[in-house]
From Swiss-Prot:
Keywords: ATP-binding, Cell membrane, Kinase, Membrane, Nucleotide-binding, Phosphoprotein, Transferase, Transmembrane, Transmembrane helix, Two-component regulatory system. The modification Phosphohistidine is found at H390. The chain crosses the membrane at residues 4-26, 45-67, 87-109, 122-139, 154-176, 183-205. It comes from Staphylococcus epidermidis (strain ATCC 12228 / FDA PCI 1200). It is an enzyme of class 2 (transferase). This is Sensor protein LytS. The gene is lytS. It is found in: Cell membrane. It comes from the Bacteria. InterPro entries: Bact_2-comp_sensor_kinase, GAF-like_dom_sf, HATPase_C_sf, Sig_transdc_His_kin_internal, Sig_transdc_His_kinase_LytS_TM. It catalyses: ATP + protein L-histidine = ADP + protein N-phospho-L-histidine.
Amino acid sequence: MLNLFILLLERVGLIILLAYILMNINHFKTMMSERDKWRSKFQLIIIFGIFSMISNFTGIEIENGHIVSSDIYYHLSKDASMANTRVLTIGVSGLIGGPWVAIIVGIISGLCRLYIGGADAYTYLISSIVIAIISGYFGHQTIKQNTYPSIKKGAIIGAITEIIQMGCILLFTNNLHHAITLVSFIALPMIIINSLGTAIFLTIILSTIKQEEQMRAVQTHDVLQLANETLPYFRSGLNEKSAQQAAEIILKLMQVSAVAITNKKDILTHIGAGSDHHVARKEIITDLSKEVIQSGKLKVAHTREGIGCHHPNCPLEGAIVVPLYIHNEVAGTLKFYFTDNNIISTSDQQLAKGLANIFSSQLELGQAEMQGQLLKDAEIKSLQAQVNPHFFFNAINTISALVRIDSEKARRLLIQLSQFFRSNLNGARNNTITLQKELQQVAAYLSLEQARYPNRFNIHYRIDDQCQDALIPPFIIQILVENSIKHAFKNRKKNNHIDVDVSMKQDCLSISVQDNGQGIPADQLDTIGYTTVTSTTGTGNALVNLNKRLTGLFGTTSALNIQSSQSGTTVSCLIPYKSSKEEHFNESVNR
């Protein structure tokens, strides 16, 4: 029995080794994070199907309670049986991929075992399917929660599935005496090995995922810290002063030898190694930077030749160069240089890419602000382009606090913040946007607010289907929702509700935002939306600005209508209905 235990341990070691190799392949890691998708399930079926065949063909031949051979077998004699790790592969496939993956892998494994033959070979097809259903059930529960079974739970399930296997051997045998002899010899080693193998398999998966999450958390924290300190500079545009200030901060906080920022032609700043010949106000001298500007794609160099600096004494041996964009056009580059090309990591590349995206957004916002001031409708444009700095820094601080607690949630909120800024930028370019885009902007804003104040409020939408393509002024619903959150519920932490209603009213679009808050004082009701007020919670300037935009675009008939009592406040307006499809048609005709 001890000899059997050692031989089975060798077989489990082979499967575990393959699992470890797979978990260090980026494609497999991505697939594991998308287990609920059929594409990933199909790939898991292929992988575990191969594992199950390896488990079958590397089994140990048993006959009359003795080990006959541990060679690779394709066929067994009619009286022989086999001890293998087939149950392990089926069980783990179910715990990871769910019932469908497990059942198909179980059928593949069972048919493979049936092909090998031996005593009561059909029994193993039946047991494979039963084990697949049981392990798949437990796997389905964790997939719904986007988690994995604990190591302890996996070990218990591994033992249970092997016990079920032994039960099937005894239940479906044609020779009970032979089955009892077989089970008494293989049961204990196989139960222990299967339980241990399942636990080790899950340990590899969980430890790899934890390591990835920790790395993402560190990366996100680094990006946020750098973004928080460098954001003010790029709002003024891509120039020598802003580039110099940002590069100094990046060099201080990152493990790089030099930092450079360029526009499309000239070096704006270069700080660190190589600054004796990589000089600001001179033309770009590296071939790598020119390639990035031309292609618009991130590039990495691991040699001096790859960088393309032709100075004979240049100390730079590696570089990461990322394009900076303004309105989908390359405006310059952000460059990280290294004097040791062996320390360039994937995390450095991701960090550079993330910073470049944030800097590009800030450059776009800054340019939009400058352009807005030059337009005839500067007042409306500037109102639309406003991004509350307090809201932004509060959002950054909230995400920073979540990074080490829940990195996945922090990542989602960072995406929402990016969406929020993108919507602000789009709003700065247009007097109107579709209702659908406005609701996406509201959703991005609410995600960030809910992160700061969990379960503080609920929002309900009643949107007519025919209104989805309607054109409305940017931020109109967001401002009204934000106003309710900030003012209506300031003294109450629960049972707060906001209702957003958009419907057709004759030829106009009716927009209404209602809350069940404390209401507006009667002495302020007539002035809200027209003049600023003195208050500890705000001045009402957002509603004044919104009212000016509405009346400026559509006339006084579209001014805000505010009704308030102690049971809540309703703010509504009527604007002429115009469809984005109609607008697109008119533009096509005018061309």
